[in-house]
Amino acid sequence: MMKLALFSIIVILFSLIGSIHGADVPGNYPLDSSGNKYPCTVLGDNQSCIDVCKKHGVKYGYCYSFKCWCEFLEDKNVSI
């Protein structure tokens, strides 16, 4: 019985690790006309980052590490 409980706990832990790692969404930092990343001050949902990402052709972005990050932004659309 103890082995079954231990096995169950291990399976659950590996499942959680897999779901956390699998949540990564591809994207990129957009660049302005000078080749600089767009700065932001409010981390997380940020309307200015969403606006920047829309200029680069994607629907959503947010402030990450004080720079705008755009989800699903491809390399070819990074620079304006």
Curated annotation (Swiss-Prot):
Q: Which cysteines are joined by disulfide bonds?
A: C40-C63, C49-C68, C53-C70
Q: Which domain of life is it from?
A: Eukaryota
- Output the CDD domains linked to this UniProt entry: neurotoxins_LC_scorpion
Q: What is this protein called?
A: Toxin Acra I-2
Similarity comment: Belongs to the long (3 C-C) scorpion toxin superfamily. Sodium/Potassium channel inhibitor family.
Please state what the annotation says regarding this protein's domains: Has the structural arrangement of an alpha-helix connected to antiparallel beta-sheets by disulfide bonds (CS-alpha/beta).
Main localization category: secreted
Q: In which tissues is it expressed?
A: Expressed by the venom gland.
**LCN-type CS-alpha/beta domain location, by residue?**
25-80
What Pfam families would the database entry show? Toxin_3 (PF00537)
Protein role = Probable neurotoxin that inhibits ion channels. Is toxic to mice. Is about 2.8% of the total protein in the venom.
Q: Which segments of the protein form a coiled coil according to its record?
A: none
Against InterPro entries, the record matches this protein to: LCN-type_CS_alpha_beta_dom, Scorpion_toxin-like_sf, Scorpion_toxinL/defensin
One example GO MF annotation: sodium channel inhibitor activity
Claim: Secreted is one of the keywords in the record: yes
Subcellular location(s): the record lists: Secreted
One of the record's GO cellular component terms: extracellular region
What keyword terms does UniProt attach to this protein? Disulfide bond, Ion channel impairing toxin, Neurotoxin, Secreted, Signal, Toxin
What residue range is the signal peptide?
1-22
